[in-house]
Amino acid sequence: LYYPLGGWIINDIDTNTDYEIPLSDPKQSATIATTSYIVNREVNDKLWTPNLPFFFPSYFLDNMPSFQLGMINTAANTALALSRVMPPLPDGENKPNRLDTAVEMLQYPGTVWLFSLENNLVPAPSSTKQYRRAIRQLNKYNQALSAGIIVFTPRAGDLKTILALTGGNLKRANLDLEKQIREFSSSWFDGKADNVFY
């Protein structure tokens, strides 16, 4: 019962889109706040399942790990798009843009627990540790906006840049789905279609 019951209890895919994230200051970015909220929801409010080893009951879960990886990938792409248009911190040559740091942390592989399989089982920072760091960087950037340390003046060109990057991400996701359908639609069973979907 350990694996089926434990997996059933852990399994939690939140597809609700009806979120209103309150801002403490109108100068803050709602997009950054929402991105931080979603990452926090998947990493802290839930159990992060993609990196757990076989002795956790979530090891045999299929859709939830794929969903969580997809949410982090979307958060990374959103932060990357914002980093292209949002101003850096003052003295940017000496201080890294906190959005750039958040992007780097969110692009970290989501399957690292205590050791990296890609690096001969050498101890490595866990995925959750890196994603929590990303949350802090996103929140600090919004705090800098609120304090007036960073001033963002929206321009039409900024929206165009964000929409172009977002459109490119959606196109790649659509191509992945089309490829899966094209290559496996004639199969009796396709165990990866749901993973690609999520």
Where are the language model's segments positioned?
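Hydrophobic membrane-insertion alpha-helices, especially the h-region
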Residues: 1-4
